[in-house]
């Protein structure tokens, strides 16, 4: 996965979701990332079509992997765990 492809997918209606806690999110997050904590992923209103590209990240990767599996169970077909903050930085994402 590369940043250009991810940005292309996001521009076409995809989502970038930070699944960390609100406290972690407020300390810094990827620009334009939507906060949906992994504990709320079961019932959260996901503002994307079932076939839209959805990218997830957390601090280290496991919470994003958990959230990805839940979203797949909910019928979302293009869900990708991008890993943790270090992975996001390595991909070239801007943090705010």
Give the positions of each predicted feature.
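Short, surface-exposed ligand- or partner-binding patches at beta-edge/loop junctions that are enriched
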Residues: 57-58
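Rhodanese-like catalytic fold shared by cysteine-dependent sulfurtransferases
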Residues: 2-15, 21-53, 62-96
């Amino acid at each position: 996965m590369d940043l250009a492809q991810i940005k292309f997918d996001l521009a076409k209606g995809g989502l970038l979701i930070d699944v960390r806690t609100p406290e972690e999110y407020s300390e810094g997050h990827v620009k334009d990332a939507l906060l949906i904590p992994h504990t709320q992923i079961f019932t959260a209103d996901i503002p994307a079509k079932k076939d839209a590209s959805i990218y997830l990240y957390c601090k280290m990767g496991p919470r994003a992997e958990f959230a990805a599996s839940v979203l797949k169970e909910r019928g979302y077909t293009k869900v990708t765990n991008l890993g943790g903050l270090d992975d996001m930085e390595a991909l070239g994402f801007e943090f705010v």
